[in-house]
């Protein structure tokens, strides 16, 4: 097998931005931010918007997403069109 064909696969901590829950897993993604884990090791930290700890499919809870602001911003920028 050729060397340098596959990216570096290493331990990484993903943290849910809304719940604060952290998950130690392996990934090819890198980050400048680091965090000290429970085992005493220091790992790259990536903060993500949604994980299994906050996604409605996994939690069974429905949460209202704030999309009204996005729609209004789109309509202001591009104008509201008339229905056909």
Curated annotation (Swiss-Prot):
Keyword Ribonucleoprotein: yes
Residues in coiled coil: none
Highest taxon, organism lineage: Bacteria
Gene Ontology, cellular component aspect: ribonucleoprotein complex; ribosome
The keyword Cell division is annotated on this UniProt entry: no
Entry's Gene Ontology molecular function annotations: structural constituent of ribosome
Gene3D superfamilies reported in the protein's UniProt record: Ribosomal protein L31 (4.10.830.30)
Biological process terms in GO annotation: translation
Swiss-Prot/TrEMBL keywords: Ribonucleoprotein, Ribosomal protein
SUBUNIT field: Part of the 50S ribosomal subunit.
Family: Belongs to the bacterial ribosomal protein bL31 family. Type B subfamily.
This protein's name: Large ribosomal subunit protein bL31B
């Amino acid at each position: 097998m050729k060397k340098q064909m596959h990216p570096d696969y290493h331990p990484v901590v993903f943290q849910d931005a809304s719940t604060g829950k952290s998950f130690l897993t392996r990934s090819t993604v890198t980050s400048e931010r680091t965090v000290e884990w429970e085992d005493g090791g220091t790992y790259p930290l990536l903060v993500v918007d949604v994980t299994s700890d906050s996604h409605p499919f996994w939690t069974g809870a429905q949460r209202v997403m704030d999309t009204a602001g996005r729609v209004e911003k789109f309509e202001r920028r591009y104008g509201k069109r008339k229905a056909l």
